[in-house]
């Protein structure tokens, strides 16, 4: 038994006992001649394989009279007979085909179905291994639900029949962004860079996209930017005036926000609709903004944007332990000491964002000499007026 792959080439062996050229014939199960020889010439019969069958003439003088069948078809599955030296050798050929149900370019979350084509009467089994090492077994139909971006690559599938095996390689491309979600941490006023790299590469990439943004302070989301993608080049269609984003013209998709401000802190969803695909690619992006301020006798550290309840916000004087540290979005210190203070946002001891602010010492305001002169003059005038009134009243009495 020899197993072959649909569309591939197979070689059926036939050897003579002596290493010399002799007459041979290959026939199918209906005794119809496929090919043979006449001296040193290759002859062909009237079978359906006449245009796809061949033999290695260079090996005839070694007693090797194999038949090569190109572009195999499922219907080529049958028993073939080699007649040489007054003897017959039978070889059973079974041809299998393994194909994806619709397309080998699938969006993340979609299902992959592999269908096995097999000759009548066979009972093969299929075992496939994904690029991330996951094994899937099945019969004539093999289904893989909820594809992940790690499933992109070459799938190796082994078809087994009668203790023989044949291996298939199928390239699957999972259309997705490299990350499902990302968070950018910035101090107030800093420039913000958003990047959306794709987890796949294609020769031609055409589609359109949009970034919707839900600011933490806003009651509803709004579209920040829309764009087109053609031959891996990006062109902006529409962009808001506040904020006015800038977008790179080449892949990977790249957005720049001039300043990180509290009113922009929030979550966004970038969608990318590819040509000939009904569903869209998605990536979530978050922006967390930090502000450290001093007002009168109060030093405050605040963050805006989506943060985990487990994150810790702290304020500490340089080279000292934290004065205040808690799982909150705002902390403050009353009457802070003079020096450089650090506002720190951390996750399990790992710093995510920090901002430094210098607290200047406050001194009592000195009394100016001119103020003393004015106060003295006013006091003298009041005293003089009071004495005058006193003596006038006394004289009248």
From Swiss-Prot:
Can you give the residue ranges of the Ig-like C2-type domain?
99-176, 177-290, 291-347
Q: What GO biological process terms does the UniProt entry carry, in alphabetical order?
A: adaptive immune response; cell adhesion; T cell differentiation; T cell selection
Q: Which residues lie on this side of the membrane: Cytoplasmic?
A: 392-397
- What does the UniProt PTM comment say about this protein? Palmitoylation and association with LCK contribute to the enrichment of CD4 in lipid rafts.
Please indicate if the UniProt record lists Membrane as a keyword: yes
One cellular component GO annotation, for this chain's record?
plasma membrane
Recorded hits in InterPro entries, A to Z, give:
CD4, CD4-extracel, Ig-like_dom, Ig-like_dom_sf, Ig-like_fold, Ig_C2-set, Ig_sub, Ig_sub2
UniProt keyword annotations, A-Z = Adaptive immunity, Cell membrane, Disulfide bond, Glycoprotein, Immunity, Immunoglobulin domain, Lipoprotein, Membrane, Palmitate, Repeat, Transmembrane, Transmembrane helix
Segments crossing the lipid bilayer: 370-391
Q: Which residues are glycosylated?
A: 15, 269, 298
What domain comment accompanies this record?
The Ig-like V-type domain mediates the interaction with MHCII.
**Can you name this protein?**
T-cell surface glycoprotein CD4
| Biological classification of the source | Eukaryota, Metazoa, Chordata, Craniata, Vertebrata
């Amino acid at each position: 038994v020899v197993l072959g792959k649909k569309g591939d080439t197979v070689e059926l062996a036939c050897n003579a006992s002596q290493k010399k050229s002799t007459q041979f014939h290959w026939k199918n199960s209906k005794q119809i001649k496929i090919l043979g020889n006449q001296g040193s010439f290759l002859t062909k019969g009237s079978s359906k394989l006449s245009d796809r069958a061949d033999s290695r003439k260079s090996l005839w003088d070694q007693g090797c009279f194999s038949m090569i069948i190109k572009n195999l078809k499922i219907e080529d599955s049958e028993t073939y007979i080699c007649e040489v030296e007054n003897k017959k050798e039978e070889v059973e050929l079974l041809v299998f085909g393994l194909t994806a149900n619709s397309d080998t370019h699938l969006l993340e979350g979609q299902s992959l179905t592999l269908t096995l084509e097999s000759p009548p009467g066979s009972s093969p089994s299929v075992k496939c291994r994904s690029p991330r090492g996951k094994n899937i077994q099945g019969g004539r139909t093999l289904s893989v639900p909820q594809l992940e971006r790690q499933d992109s690559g070459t799938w190796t599938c082994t078809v087994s029949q009668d203790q023989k095996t044949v291996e298939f390689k199928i390239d699957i491309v999972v259309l997705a962004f490299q990350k499902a979600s990302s968070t950018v941490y910035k101090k107030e006023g800093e420039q913000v860079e958003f990047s959306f790299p794709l987890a796949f590469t294609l020769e031609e990439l055409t589609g359109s996209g949009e970034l919707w943004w839900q600011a933490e302070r806003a009651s509803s989301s709004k579209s920040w930017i829309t764009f087109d993608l053609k031959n891996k080049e990006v062109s902006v269609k529409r962009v808001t005036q506040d904020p006015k984003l800038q977008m790179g013209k080449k892949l990977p998709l790249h957005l720049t926000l001039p300043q990180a401000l509290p009113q922009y802190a929030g979550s966004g969803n970038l969608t990318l609709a590819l040509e000939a695909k009904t569903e869209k690619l998605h990536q979530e992006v978050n922006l967390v903004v930090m502000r450290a301020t001093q007002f009168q006798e109060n030093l405050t550290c605040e963050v805006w944007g989506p943060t985990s309840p487990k994150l810790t916000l702290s304020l500490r004087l340089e080279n000292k332990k934290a004065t205040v540290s808690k799982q909150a979005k705002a902390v403050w210190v009353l009457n802070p000491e003079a020096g450089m203070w650090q506002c720190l946002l951390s996750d399990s001891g790992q710093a995510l964002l920090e901002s430094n602010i210098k607290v200047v010492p406050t001194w009592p305001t000195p009394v100016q000499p001119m103020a003393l002169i004015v106060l003295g003059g006013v006091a003298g005038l009041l005293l003089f007026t009071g004495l005058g009134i006193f003596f006038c009243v006394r004289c009248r009495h």
